[in-house]
A protein has these predicted regions:
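A structure-centric signal for secondary-structure junctions around beta-strands
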Residues: 46-49, 73, 94-96
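Histidine-centered metal-chelating micro-motifs
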Residues: 77, 82-87, 107
Length: 162
């Protein structure tokens, strides 16, 4: 199974644009924008990154560990480092939503580095993504817009506060 140790290598494999920051990437398609599509299919892979994404899958399944995620109504998905991901060409994405990806070392030396391991939504025990109401989706999109602004404008050490 292929494993990606850096965020850049993982995004390159997915055929997505490289990150603005070596340990953090933000892809946002809020409003009239479109999310870039990852490569069409993938055998099982792992990486050293966390991902938080809001996606809608028009058809097909994304396999995460032993679980198939249901994205038809739009849902937040949380992926932890070294979790197994796999998808095939049957997956068709709606190109709206967002994806925030960060290397586990991005959190090094922070309280969140210890706390994040307690969040069950990053583990296999969560059998499906977190489904959002339209109101919740708008609230999350607003937060992500602010994160994206910070990501695009501040690439120094203070960006770790994101």
């Amino acid at each position: 199974m292929q494993h990606f140790k850096t965020l850049s290598a993982y995004l390159d494999y997915l055929e997505l644009p490289g990150p603005e920051h070596p340990m953090l990437s933000v892809f946002s398609a809020i409003g009239d924008g479109f999310l870039p599509c990852p490569k069409e299919s993938s055998p099982p892979i792992t990486n050293d990154c966390y991902s938080i994404s809001l996606k809608k899958i028009v058809k097909g399944n994304l396999n995460y560990g032993r679980t198939k995620y249901d994205f038809t109504n739009g849902a937040l998905i949380f992926i932890a480092p070294r979790q197994v991901l796999q998808w095939d060409e049957s997956v068709v994405y709606d190109q709206k939503g967002f994806s925030i990806n960060f290397h586990e070392d991005f959190l090094k030396g922070t309280e969140l580095a210890h706390q994040i391991k307690k969040y069950s939504f990053f583990s296999y025990s969560a059998n499906e993504a977190l489904h959002l109401s339209p109101k919740e989706e708008k609230q999350i999109e607003s937060i992500v817009e602010n994160i994206d602004i910070e990501y695009q404008n501040n690439q120094d050490d203070s960006a770790r506060i994101l």
